[in-house]
């Protein structure tokens, strides 16, 4: 299988998000890369499904709760920006203060 660097990056994001989701299901508190991977994968898949930018910005803020992450992580992540491919083109999705 030959993958472009862009495709390799997307695959790595999805693998990291899968690992993070399994850890979260076991009750393990998530670290910075795991949180970013989960939010990024959520946005990429939502764009692929045809959801709107606004809808993804809103749902991205509700994805992870403060008690699911390690101490100090909510203060470290102010924005998550993802360039996602929508049916009508590529758009930048920004999730502000993603951990509530």
UniProtKB/Swiss-Prot annotation:
The keyword Zinc does not apply. InterPro entries: Urease_gamma, Urease_gamma/gamma-beta_su, Urease_gamma_sf, Urease_subunit. It catalyses: urea + 2 H2O + H(+) = hydrogencarbonate + 2 NH4(+). One of its GO terms (biological process) is urea catabolic process. Keywords: Cytoplasm, Hydrolase. It is an enzyme of class 3 (hydrolase). Gene3D superfamilies: Urease, gamma-like subunit. One of its GO terms (cellular component) is cytoplasm. Its main location: cytoplasm. Pfam families: Urease_gamma (PF00547). Its EC number is 3.5.1.5. GO terms for molecular function: nickel cation binding; urease activity. Heterotrimer of UreA (gamma), UreB (beta) and UreC (alpha) subunits. Three heterotrimers associate to form the active enzyme. This is Urease subunit gamma. It comes from Streptomyces coelicolor (strain ATCC BAA-471 / A3(2) / M145).
């Amino acid at each position: 299988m030959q993958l472009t660097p862009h495709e390799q990056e997307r695959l790595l994001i999805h693998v990291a998000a899968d690992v993070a989701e399994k850890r979260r299901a076991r009750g393990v508190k998530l670290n910075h890369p795991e949180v970013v991977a989960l939010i990024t994968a959520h946005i990429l898949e939502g764009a692929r499904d045809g959801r709107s930018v606004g809808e993804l910005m809103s749902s991205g803020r509700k994805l992870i709760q403060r008690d699911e992450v390690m101490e100090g992580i909510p203060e470290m992540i102010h924005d998550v920006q993802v360039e996602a491919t929508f049916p009508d083109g590529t758009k930048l999705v920004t999730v502000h203060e993603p951990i509530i």
